[in-house]
Regions:
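N-terminal active-site segment of His-dependent metallophosphoesterases
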Residues: 1-52, 63-72, 142-144, 177-182
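Short beta-strand micro-motifs in enzyme catalytic cores
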Residues: 2, 73-75, 83-85, 128, ...
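Active-site neighborhood of phospho(di)ester-bond hydrolases with catalytic His/Asp-centered motifs
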Residues: 5-7, 33-39, 55-61, 86-88, ...
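Helix-adjacent hinge/juxtasegments
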Residues: 56-98
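Short, solvent-exposed aromatic-acidic interface loops
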Residues: 158-169
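Pre-active-site segment of Zn-dependent metallo-hydrolases
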Residues: 13-26, 86-87, 91-105
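Conserved beta-sheet core of the metallophosphoesterase superfamily
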Residues: 56, 92-158
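Short, conserved loop/helix-junction motifs that constitute active-site signature segments
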Residues: 49-52, 79, 105-107
Length: 182
């Protein structure tokens, strides 16, 4: 089974198709399952994505009230005998994924997909920790997603990257300072 994991799309207005990289849209449509680890921002973005792929999702800290009411904070799904946990905030940073590892243990999962950091990471120990980064607003990384393949209990995963801005946090800071006359 081919799974695409994304997070932190932060689509505030307009079509999700307009904001996501074209290569990612193709991957989403071809996937058996898409997992979104929160921060769609609007219900419209969630609804549109649900219309183009089979979607499992949780809400993130920036999602609107409608999404927070309809999507759980965390969930566990099972795919071909593999338990996958989905949560938005699991690690304080990509440099230290200890919190994510403990969350995976607490959720009793084989794979933990999480977001919030806007930077991709795949880390394998006794569980697979997978943060897809952000395809639209990465932080000091390239726009990204994760491709997972699960076949008869064997799991493989990789980060895929797309063309686009790589330093949105810096762009935001510059924009803030320009708006405030600094």
């Amino acid at each position: 089974m081919k799974i695409i994991a994304i997070a932190d799309t932060h689509i505030k207005s307009g079509s999700i198709i307009e904001h996501l990289p074209a290569e990612l849209i193709t991957l989403l449509k071809e996937a058996d399952l898409v997992i979104h680890a929160g921060d769609f921002v609007t219900r419209a973005a969630f609804d549109e994505l649900s219309g183009i792929c089979r979607l499992e999702a949780v809400h993130g800290n920036m999602d609107d009230a409608a999404l927070k009411e309809s999507l759980p904070e965390q969930k566990v799904i099972e795919v071909e005998g593999t338990r996958i946990g989905i949560i938005h905030e699991a690690a304080l940073s990509i440099q230290d994924t200890t919190g994510a590892w403990y969350m995976a243990k607490e959720m009793n999962v084989d794979i933990l997909i999480f977001g919030h950091t806007h930077r991709p990471v795949i880390e394998k120990s006794d569980v697979l920790l997978a943060c897809p980064g952000s395809p639209t607003s990465p932080r000091l990384s390239e726009p990204g997603a994760i491709v997972l393949d699960i076949d008869r209990g064997k799991i493989s995963g990789k980060v895929v990257t797309f063309e686009g801005p790589v330093c949105s946090i810096i762009e935001s800071a510059v924009s803030y300072h320009m708006q405030n006359g600094r």
